[in-house]
């Protein structure tokens, strides 16, 4: 089990595939995503990595977090989150994960917080049909109707759909396809919509219901390995200068 990543939602756009069809995608950005702490079986009873992403001003960071980031020798982060991993996929502190962590065609599970809608009625919140528009009905056109039975059981059961706060809840969308990645700009393009507003922090993990592609990097797509791969592909040019030549 590999680590997930923390990405920032930039918005939606569309790209064209080889068949000329446009594909709606959500653009997620990885910005300085580094490991800031480890969790081991010997010390914590489980194996995990704590990731930090983004940049935060020192004056806006608490004293406790300043010491936490200083211990890891990383800059203060805007967002931190923890991901369970298997012991063989444990990453060293300070390791930076890039967009190469995911490969095109891979399925991922995306977790975000939906946009808050405020207080909403049952017709908007739960898609109720409402009451009659006329024929003796007044005031209760959009009411939810009965909330339960009679003296027995004499209560409203938990989970009864009523009016209330809509949105602003944590939602995980499973099996979203990774359309493409841009390692240089740290972008991950996933098919379709992702819960959350623009600028929201999104957690992206390998799909638990789909197999991991064979070409997915293990233990992770880290910055150093990505740099070495680029150097291997780039042509090598040799230049020599003779000092003091006349």
Swiss-Prot record:
One of the primary rRNA binding proteins, it binds directly near the 3'-end of the 23S rRNA, where it nucleates assembly of the 50S subunit. GO terms for cellular component: cytosolic large ribosomal subunit. GO terms for biological process: translation. GO terms for molecular function: rRNA binding; structural constituent of ribosome. Keywords: Methylation, Ribonucleoprotein, Ribosomal protein, RNA-binding, rRNA-binding. This is Large ribosomal subunit protein uL3. The modification N5-methylglutamine is found at residue 151. Part of the 50S ribosomal subunit. Forms a cluster with proteins L14 and L19. Belongs to the universal ribosomal protein uL3 family. Methylated by PrmB. The keyword Ribonucleoprotein applies. It comes from the Bacteria.
């Amino acid at each position: 089990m590999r680590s997930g990543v923390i990405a920032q939602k930039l918005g939606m756009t569309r790209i064209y595939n080889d068949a000329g069809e446009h594909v709606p995608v959500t653009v997620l950005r990885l910005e300085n995503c580094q490991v800031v702490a480890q969790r081991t079986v010997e010390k914590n009873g489980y194996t995990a990595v704590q990731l930090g992403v983004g940049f935060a001003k020192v004056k806006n960071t608490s004293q406790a977090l300043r010491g936490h980031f200083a211990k890891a020798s990383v800059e203060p982060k805007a967002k931190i989150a923890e991901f369970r991993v298997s012991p063989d996929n444990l990453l060293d502190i300070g390791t930076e994960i890039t967009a190469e962590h995911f490969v095109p065609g891979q399925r991922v599970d995306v977790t975000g917080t939906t946009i808050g809608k405020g207080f909403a009625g049952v017709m908007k919140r739960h898609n109720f049909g409402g009451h009659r528009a006329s024929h003796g009905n007044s005031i209760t056109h959009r009411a939810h109707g009965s909330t339960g039975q009679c003296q027995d059981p004499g209560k409203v059961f938990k989970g009864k759909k009523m009016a209330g706060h809509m949105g602003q809840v944590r939602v995980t969308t499973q099996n979203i396809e990774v359309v493409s990645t841009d390692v240089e700009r740290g972008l991950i393009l996933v098919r379709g919509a992702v819960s959350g507003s623009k600028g929201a922090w999104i957690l992206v993990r390998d799909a638990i219901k789909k197999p991991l592609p064979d070409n997915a990097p293990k233990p992770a797509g880290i910055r150093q390995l990505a740099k070495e791969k680029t150097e291997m592909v780039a042509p090598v040019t040799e230049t020599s200068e003779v000092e003091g030549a006349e």
